[in-house]
Amino acid sequence: SHDFGKDIIPTMLNDGKSLYAYKFKGYWKDVGTIDSLWEANMDLLNKNNELNLDDPNWKIYTEDIPTLPHYVGPTGKVEHCYINQGAVIRGHAVDSVLFNNVDIDEDAFVSQAVLMPNVKVGKGAKIYRAIVADGVKIDDGAVVGSPDSEEIVLISKRVKKGE
């Protein structure tokens, strides 16, 4: 495990290494668990926290890979989401963070999810409260998570209908 509070800092202290602190004001979150990683991404959607991506004094520099802008098709619907370049939405996405080149097909529904780069969500698939890893394909009609559950689901491999 590589958790700062549970592993790295105690090991450094046991090894007699020097540790230094830096007082930081603003948003910070340890994302060492699935739940905290999901929460940090959902914080992007919450305008009432210290994480303000619209602040012109707090620039975020990233590698800008040439790609098409995101596209919401005629059957697509997006509510309260962050959408990265190259994403194509023909289904319905709500309260989610969609990374680059995500593809959500027609009649698919995504809610409170974090879809990492290159995720493909098949026609009629449903995703609830999940983190879907880079490059994963969710097959047509597959269901991930439950709208009635508080549990965060981590998907790191292809999901077929009925799994």
Model-derived regions, located:
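Left-handed beta-helix
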Residues: 1-163
